[in-house]
Amino acid sequence: EPTPEEEKKAAGIMKSLKAEHLMDRPVVAMSSGEQVKVLIARALMTNPELMILDEPSVYLDLAGREFLLKTIEELAATRPDLTMIFITQRIEDILPVFDCGMILKSGQIVASGSRDEVLTEENLKNAFDLDIQLIRTDKGRLWTVIR
């Protein structure tokens, strides 16, 4: 049974995730996006130093993905002590929040380093065997065009 302090902390975290309406709803009655919010809230309850996000946006619709990315961006800004490892096949999901990263292909490192060192057309071509053109928007988002 949670203590009053834990209940207060949980309510604050759920409010910050705009998910307070989910506090009494069974997980099986939640959408995939709602479940992601609850999982992030559960992780934040422990004040982690490290969060591993393994394909967190895979089942989310466009609105859910945008919310997730904004949440991650806010966490990066408000929790400088929190290291997040974000595993994804959607490179646009990790911008503009990642400081450093790597691209893997068949378990081998294709590139590692800063965002600008990693996200190059050459590295992406080597990783995915595709002719890719990168286009960065003014907000730091990245779009890929396969030629």
Residue map of PLM features:
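Catalytic Walker B motif of ABC-type/P-loop ATPase nucleotide-binding domains
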Residues: 51-55
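Conserved ABC ATPase "signature" region
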Residues: 4-22, 47
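Conserved ABC ATPase signature
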Residues: 26-30, 34
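H-loop/switch region of ABC-family ATPase nucleotide-binding domains
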Residues: 88-89
